[in-house]
Amino acid sequence: TQHHCQGSRKADDPVGLAAYGMDSHNVQRYVDPNGHVRNEGDVEVGGFSPYPISYRAIVPRANECANLLVPVCLSASHIAYGSIRMEPVFMVLGQSAATAAAHAIDESVPVQRVDGDKLHQRLRSDQQILKWTGQVRSDQPNLDSARLLRTRSDHIGISNHAAGR
């Protein structure tokens, strides 16, 4: 939710981090009475630290659907999804979902009953970052999600958009 993005709530079962500012592109453009083109519906909220995304966000309730993981169509408010929608976040959540699926198969349980401690242990052993321990520079409050995506070679990509360039 927006509360998680802005740090007023913390996920107690994280499977990855996101960090992009919450944004939503304009709904339409119109010409105002003075003849100026204006955007309507722009949303831009930033200035928060990287935040954890809950396992519960990628797993539908058992009474709704069994054994489905949704790392892209996850449960989030439309404002929070403006932050989560970045490809590096989807890649992290996809990896976490695959790890959870493997655990569910190995333990013969539905994904809703995967042992969270075992899942977190495996994600950490795979070098998944589940908790942000770094600091946010005051001149660059919107850290790019790509900084949180680490591969075995530690190669990362940085977007200029997040820094406002």
Feature locations, PLM:
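Flavin (FAD/FMN)-binding glycine-rich loop and adjacent Rossmann-like elements that form
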Residues: 1-125, 129, 133-150
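Surface-exposed loop and adjacent secondary-structure segments within mature catalytic domains
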Residues: 155, 160
